Amino acid sequence: MKLDNHLLYIDITQVCDIGCSFCMYTDKHSRENMILTQAARENLRNLINDEGVKRVSISGEGEPIYNLKVFKEILKLSGGGVAFEFITSGFVNHERLLKIYNEISEIILSNGDSCNIRLSSDSYHIDKIPNKPHGFSIQQFIKLNNEFMSLSFRSIDIDKEFTR
């Protein structure tokens, strides 16, 4: 199959403790993390490094921070020049979040890749997350000053005042 300007979307977990009322996956969560077999690694390596893949988006039908081991394994499959995206609520404490950002930065810099961290700013998540990651993440990305890592926010909310 020839890929052309393709988005490769990989769900790495079905574990989530947030329990958003809008979530279409809540009743389907198996509470399992993806495990990469050798065959899966080879298939993903081929897909990730295919010249027709524009971006590799890592998320979950849950919170992908619960499966960082596999996320880092996937990053390491790159042959270089891959644009990754990590979609998360960023619910962990700030110290752990900074450690995650630094680990991602180290891997992508060693491979010659880039990674955009997309933090949720859904009001459903904000109400349930004790460690608000948004302001902290903005500060850390300014300090990090890494041209290969970027930060963005995503929301399903239509309340523009909330997402400002």
Protein language model features and the residues they cover:
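Conserved glycine-rich "GG(E/T)P / GGGxP" loop and the immediately following alpha-helix
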Residues: 2-13, 21-163
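Helical H-box/DHp helix segment flanking the catalytic phospho-acceptor histidine
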Residues: 17
